[in-house]
UniProtKB/Swiss-Prot annotation:
Domain of life from the UniProt record: Bacteria
Protein's GO biological process: L-leucine biosynthetic process
Record GO cellular component, one term: 3-isopropylmalate dehydratase complex
InterPro entries referenced in this protein's UniProt entry, alphabetically: 3-IsopropMal_deHydase_ssu (IPR004431), Aconitase/3IPM_dehydase_swvl (IPR015928), AconitaseA/IPMdHydase_ssu_swvl (IPR000573), IPMI_Swivel (IPR033940), LeuD (IPR050075)
Pathway: Amino-acid biosynthesis; L-leucine biosynthesis; L-leucine from 3-methyl-2-oxobutanoate: step 2/4
UniProt xrefs under NCBIfam families: leuD (TIGR00171), PRK01641.1 (NF002458)
Assembly information from the UniProt record: Heterodimer of LeuC and LeuD.
Protein name: 3-isopropylmalate dehydratase small subunit
Entry's family note: Belongs to the LeuD family. LeuD type 1 subfamily.
Keyword line: Amino-acid biosynthesis, Branched-chain amino acid biosynthesis, Leucine biosynthesis, Lyase
Originating organism: Thiobacillus denitrificans (strain ATCC 25259 / T1)
Amino acid sequence: MQAFTTLDGLVVPLDRANVDTDAIIPKQFLKSIKRAGFGPNLFDEWRYLDHGEPGMDPATRQPNPAFVLNLPRYAGASVLLARDNFGCGSSREHAPWALEDYGIRAIIAPSFADIFYNNCFKNGILPIVLDAAAVDRLFGECEASAGYRLKIDLEQQTVTTPGGEVLRFEVDAGRKHRLLNGLDDIGLTLLQADKIKAYEARRRQEAPWLFA
């Protein structure tokens, strides 16, 4: 998993509350368990005017010119600005996979659905909770200024605006450690590899019939 330390990223504003995981990545794209390849179908039903199915070439589809991800000024954005209860709905881990595959490294919102919030940390995305008033200000600044960027420092737990405003956010120490060091669940387990090997060796001595 890619580590997250600091980010100076272009912001894309998604001004909708209660964005659920089916909107983030529709159910017909959930057949694959590979983490890569979901980016072209992120927000598929909003992003395109035609109905998407697995295997369709995005280059041949009809984009929705009004959807924010299709506006040239937001091309290459790595910070998603969202509203309340982002990531609600089913617990599909494909949702953060699609966001990460598109290039989103951080999401800022007043609140997140719990399971989605947890899944972000497991997939290299930093979900940042800021109060609604601060998020409102960021939306206003972003929509008023092309090329709007935010600087995010996970170690210091800060978001800095182009005008110099510093917004502080909270993050669990364990989750922070995971992101700073690029550790997913497998990576965390491998940190204990020596202890696991020692335990298995001891169990072979204590209960050899289990390994027969």
